[in-house]
Amino acid sequence: MENNFKNLKKLIAYSKNGILSKVISKTEKLDITLFCMAEGTEISEHTSTKQGFVYVIEGKGIFNLAEKDIEMSAGAFIKLDKNMVHSLKAEQNTSFLLSLVS
């Protein structure tokens, strides 16, 4: 049985000049992953075949969605439609949850 409780703050860890990802929960219809981006790291332009939601836990960065910059800061919530082009850049150590819905 999967553990039904996780303290996200305790799971946050940053790799020097890298990006860490940890699967928080995975079901047939929902994938939730914690991403921890070290300051200065980037995730290049890409798309997803699933609808997604990003919730920023801490840090500061830029989320580019369909050529529009959105500030990533604690509490920000970003909705991603299927096949939307997006990229990310961490201006500080930044952590967020990515939820993908099938």
Please state what every model-predicted region is.
Residues 67-81:
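Short acidic-glycine-tyrosine-enriched beta hairpin
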